[in-house]
């Protein structure tokens, strides 16, 4: 159990690794109950009877069952005496009026007030507040808009709303290089020529299943007319699951992919700020390599999915977000920090009369604060560099770009802030460039790519059960076995969950390489490889620790002799 906003990232990761949706939903219900019992009750024991109120408790039967299960278990553990003849489940009630108990409470309190208290004053006061009073309140509490005026917007658009360079679109002479980025909310693919020219790109919202996302992307690449593949690299959440399934040559760590994709266009970049659907990555570069890295590891308050959710609640297409936000003549000041509290702040600003475009502008304005200060913990931007590159799908939103530019230049007046020409596909481009490096480094070795027809015909099953739990250490990771039908696969007839010939098993949910195997002989091979890595790459930190506490010869006590 943790922050509800960041839990979305966990759910997306589980979907990408093949965990069934129904199991993820059940886990979310469990997390809600754990959070309430562990945090809100502060060690106290809810006494029978218990009322479950509010919309989620009323409409989600699974949440009701989670409450009944865990409260019953808690009462049993703490030896709570239940009324005679009643079981725990019968003492947990969801009334039909669960949505309206706060309203009913207001009625009860009002009925108990002395006569003459809180007498209805008519609609004139309310009308005045709607038409005039809230405008005065807004003027006192709000701030300037994202754009100071028409001239400010015109100059910004002239500098940043430059049409990105189009893909060449020509047919490649020779095998192409493909890079795919399977992100939390989107899937992207790019095609490079042997000369590393961009030939084709596609960008789509994720369907929530990595194999289906891969089928969709490769179908588009095939239809674009690139039959011969010389190298394939994957990055993003789904890379490890899909590498063997589609026959990728390499799986590239996200930081490496994004840095490579940026340095190809901006070799003198100092800082890369990548804002995606559910994560924020800040990469600080020194001499063309990543010297420091910041990730929102415990909160996703600065992500793009939050902006998308707010736009959807206002029934505004995401593509129209910036246009709507730029219409605002003023905007409220939203609090930096936790996305859950930020949502509460938005509701509070709505009560004050702020319109949709004003709140959307304010949300774009607070995003850089959350990205750099709250998530990145970077107070002094001037210390990290002078050239900042903005990328990631969220930076397709020009309102966010405007807010980022103003924030960075407010901290570093001489900063050069540039927008990646392919902000959404930067990771995929980096992966494709890594595929090109792999092909050159191997002397043109044939790619492992399985082929468009094989990927289109993929069928699979997913299993998470007691038999899939890893037993190689006390952690007991809950793994998921994803079995994919592939021609020529050997199967695993000896497994606890036998797999027939013609099927390949991909294991996800493990915390270490040992979790990728089922058989003890396979485990011995993994351990041997790990020992080989230790021998080849010494543990420098351990060497420094030993050297720091080793007594030097000069300090050693003299030996009597």
Which residues fall in each region the model found?
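Gly/Thr-rich phosphate-binding beta-strand-loop-beta motif of the actin/hexokinase/Hsp70
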Residues: 165-199, 269-289, 330, 469-484
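Flexible inter-domain linker/hinge segments
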Residues: 112-179, 183, 438-560
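Phosphate/ATP-binding catalytic cores across multiple sugar-kinase/actin-like superfamilies
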Residues: 24-48, 155-166, 362-384, 551-555
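Conserved phosphate-binding catalytic cores of ATP/NTP-utilizing and phosphoryl-transfer enzymes
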Residues: 37, 41-44, 103-107, 158-173, ...
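Glycine-rich phosphate-binding/hydrolytic loop that grips phosphoryl groups
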Residues: 81-83, 91-133, 260-261, 307-309, ...
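Glycine-rich phosphate-binding loop plus the immediately following alpha-helix
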Residues: 1-3, 8-14, 99-102, 108-112, ...
């Amino acid at each position: 159990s943790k922050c509800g906003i960041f839990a979305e990232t966990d759910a997306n990761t589980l979907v990408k690794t093949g965990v069934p949706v129904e199991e993820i939903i059940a886990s979310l219900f469990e997390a809600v109950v754990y959070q309430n019992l562990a945090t809100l009750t502060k060690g106290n024991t809810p006494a029978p009877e218990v009322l479950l109120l509010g919309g989620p408790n009323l409409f989600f039967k699974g949440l009701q069952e989670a409450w009944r299960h865990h409260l019953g278990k808690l009462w049993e553990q703490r030896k709570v005496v239940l009324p005679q003849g009643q079981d725990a489940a019968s003492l947990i009630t969801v009334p039909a009026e669960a949505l309206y108990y706060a309203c009913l409470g207001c009625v009860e309190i009002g009925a108990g007030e002395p006569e003459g208290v809180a007498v209805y004053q008519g609609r004139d006061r309310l009308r005045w507040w709607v038409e005039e009073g809230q405008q005065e309140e807004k003027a006192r509490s709000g701030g300037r808009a994202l754009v100071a005026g028409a001239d400010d917007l015109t100059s910004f658009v002239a500098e940043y709303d430059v049409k990105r360079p189009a893909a060449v679109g020509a047919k490649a002479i020779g095998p192409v290089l493909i890079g795919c980025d399977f992100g939390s909310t989107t899937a992207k693919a790019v095609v490079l020529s042997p000369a590393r020219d961009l030939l084709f790109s596609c960008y789509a919202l994720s369907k929530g299943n990595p194999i289906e996302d891969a089928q969709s992307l490769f179908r588009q690449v095939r239809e674009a007319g690139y039959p011969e593949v010389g190298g394939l690299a994957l990055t993003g959440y789904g890379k490890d699951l899909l590498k063997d399934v589609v026959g990728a040559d390499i799986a590239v760590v996200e930081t490496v992919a994004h840095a490579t994709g940026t340095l190809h266009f901006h070799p003198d970049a100092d800082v890369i700020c990548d804002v995606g659907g559910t994560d924020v990555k800040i990469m600080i570069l020194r001499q063309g390599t990543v010297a420091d890295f910041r990730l929102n590891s415990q909160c996703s308050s600065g992500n793009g999915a939050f902006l998308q959710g707010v736009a959807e609640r206002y029934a505004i297409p995401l593509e129209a977000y910036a246009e709507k936000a730029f219409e605002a003549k003023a905007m409220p000041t939203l609090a930096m920090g936790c996305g859950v509290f930020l949502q509460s702040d938005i509701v509070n600003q709505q009560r004050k009369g702020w319109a949709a475009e004003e709140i959307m502008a304010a949300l774009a304005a607070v995003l850089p604060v959350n990205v750099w200060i709250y998530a990145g913990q970077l107070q002094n931007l001037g210390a990290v560099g002078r050239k900042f590159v903005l990328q990631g799908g969220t930076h397709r939103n020009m309102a966010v770009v405007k807010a980022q530019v103003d924030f960075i230049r407010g901290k570093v007046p001489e900063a050069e802030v540039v927008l990646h020409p392919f902000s959404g596909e930067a990771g995929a481009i980096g992966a494709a460039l890594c595929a090109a490096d792999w092909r050159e480094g191997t002397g043109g070795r044939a790619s492992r790519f399985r082929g468009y027809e094989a990927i289109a015909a993929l069928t699979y099953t997913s299993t998470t059960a007691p038999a899939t739990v890893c037993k190689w250490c006390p952690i007991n990771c809950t793994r998921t076995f994803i079995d994919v039908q592939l021609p020529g696969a050997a199967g695993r007839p000896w497994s606890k969950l036998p797999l027939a010939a013609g099927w390949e098993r991909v294991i996800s949910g493990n915390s270490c390489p040992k979790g990728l195997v089922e058989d003890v002989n396979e485990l011995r091979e993994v351990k041997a490889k790990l020992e080989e890595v230790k021998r080849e790459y010494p543990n420098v930190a351990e060497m420094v620790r030993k050297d720091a506490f080793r007594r030097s010869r000069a300090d050693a006590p003299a030996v009597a002799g």
